[in-house]
Amino acid sequence: MTSRQFIVARDDLQQSRLIDVALPATDNLPVDGLLLKVDRFAFTANNITYAMLGDQLKYWSLFPAPNGYGNIPVWGFGDVIASRHPNLPEGERLFGYFPMATHLIVEAADVSKRGLRDGAAHREGVAPVYNAYTRVSGDPAFAGRAGDYQALLRPLFMLSFLVDDFLAE
């Protein structure tokens, strides 16, 4: 199985391409690893900001890409299609930060009934909000059209709290 990824040149966002990356078999996922199938995501001007500040704010480190290229991060939904974590079954639906790709491997850490954190080493050093995934299976606030609105607006809601905290300092 492969993941199709949309990547951009980090120094010229107008240069893009699609690449296919081989995915490991379930048995070869990291311990507590999840293979997520990206279902849908929002793409807004906010995502262009992530790309423009990718080096300074470490956004490019979230989703590794070939040298000189990057995966623009997006907010959206993914479904667990393979799991090596005992408390995260296949079929679980998650909301969080994804690459513009068909799949993502997450190393589940700090798992709770509400969500988890991606504990992959390459994701260290970024704001915790970008490593958090919310469990949304069965939550009507994330179903159908409501989910589309969540993908568009929830990141702005979270940003408002981060800006408030920053200004308070």
What is the role of each PLM region?
Residues 29-42, 55-105, 110:
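Glycine-rich beta-strand-centered segment in the early N-terminal region that forms part
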Residues 5, 18-20, 98:
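Hydrophobic transmembrane signal anchors and adjacent membrane-proximal interface regions, especially
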Residues 1-10:
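Short, Gly/Pro- and small/polar-rich lid/capping loops
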Residues 26, 68, 148-151:
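Residue-level "hotspot" positions that anchor or transmit function at local structural transition points
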Residues 10-40, 45:
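A short N-terminal beta-strand-loop micro-motif at the entrance of redox/enzyme domains
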Residues 46-52:
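Cytochrome P450 core scaffold surrounding the K-helix E-X-X-R motif
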